[in-house]
């Protein structure tokens, strides 16, 4: 036995709801169509958004003026990383004044949350989060950055140089 329910109360609000949603959509469509100067959308990639200087993008390993890595393989960045995306393999250096250095330094960008903990933990300013953020690629191997990708780029797209002068750091109190 089936029971018929009276849905007349609900059905009388159906058409006004549809018309109200349609009116809102048409209002925004016409506003954006005829007033494109105030539109918030950028035509990417022709127009690029200007990010703040404090923006944290892709990682950069800094090098000294002699071309050697600033990293001392202390593992503080890898220890502080909440995503565990930094892998460092350390080795002893030939120079007795240098304790160790990284022979392998990899960052898995797909796991990274760009929190900046690695940058804050580094005692020698060896890792920075630079201005680049676009990382195109088709497979996961393209997103594991090694020492060559992280450090040996003469000039990044934001004007940040990868080499750091020790004298300037000491003057600044870093």
From Swiss-Prot:
Protein name: NADH-quinone oxidoreductase subunit I
Native source organism of the sequence: Bdellovibrio bacteriovorus (strain ATCC 15356 / DSM 50701 / NCIMB 9529 / HD100)
Note describing how the cofactor binds: Binds 2 [4Fe-4S] clusters per subunit.
EC class of the enzyme, as a word: translocase
Function according to Swiss-Prot or TrEMBL: NDH-1 shuttles electrons from NADH, via FMN and iron-sulfur (Fe-S) centers, to quinones in the respiratory chain. The immediate electron acceptor for the enzyme in this species is believed to be ubiquinone. Couples the redox reaction to proton translocation (for every two electrons transferred, four hydrogen ions are translocated across the cytoplasmic membrane), and thus conserves the redox energy in a proton gradient.
UniProt KW keywords: 4Fe-4S, Cell inner membrane, Cell membrane, Iron, Iron-sulfur, Membrane, Metal-binding, NAD, Quinone, Repeat, Translocase, Ubiquinone
Transmembrane segments: none
Binding site for [4Fe-4S] cluster 1: 71, 74, 77, 122
UniProt-listed SUPFAM superfamilies: 4Fe-4S ferredoxins
UniProt catalytic activity: a quinone + NADH + 5 H(+)(in) = a quinol + NAD(+) + 4 H(+)(out)
Cofactor(s) demanded: [4Fe-4S] cluster
EC number: 7.1.1.-
Keyword Zinc among record annotations: no
Gene3D superfamilies (UniProt xref): 3.30.70.3270
Subcellular location: Cell inner membrane
Assembly mode: NDH-1 is composed of 14 different subunits. Subunits NuoA, H, J, K, L, M, N constitute the membrane sector of the complex.
Positions bound to [4Fe-4S] cluster 2: 81, 112, 115, 118
Pfam families linked to this entry: Fer4_7 (PF12838)
Coiled coil: none
InterPro entries: 4Fe4S_Fe-S-bd, 4Fe4S_Fe_S_CS, NADH_quinone_OxRdtase_chainI
CC annotations in GO: plasma membrane
Family: Belongs to the complex I 23 kDa subunit family.
């Amino acid at each position: 036995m089936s029971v018929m329910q009276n849905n007349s109360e609900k059905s009388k609000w159906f058409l006004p709801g549809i018309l109200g949603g349609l009116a809102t959509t048409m209002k925004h469509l016409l506003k954006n169509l005829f007033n494109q100067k105030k539109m918030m959308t950028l035509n990417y990639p022709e127009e690029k958004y200007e990010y703040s200087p404090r923006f944290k993008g892709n990682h950069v390993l800094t090098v000294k003026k002699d071309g050697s890595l600033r990293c001392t393989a202390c593992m503080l960045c890898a220890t502080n990383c909440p995503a565990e995306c930094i892998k460092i393999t350390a080795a002893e250096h030939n120079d007795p004044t240098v304790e160790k250095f990284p022979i392998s330094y990899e960052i898995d960008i797909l796991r990274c949350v760009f929190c900046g903990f690695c940058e804050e933990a580094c005692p020698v300013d060896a890792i920075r989060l630079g201005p680049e953020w676009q990382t195109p690629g088709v497979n996961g191997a393209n997103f594991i950055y090694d020492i060559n990708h992280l450090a040996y780029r003469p000039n990044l797209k934001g004007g940040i140089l990868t080499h750091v002068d020790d004298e300037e750091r000491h003057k600044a109190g870093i």
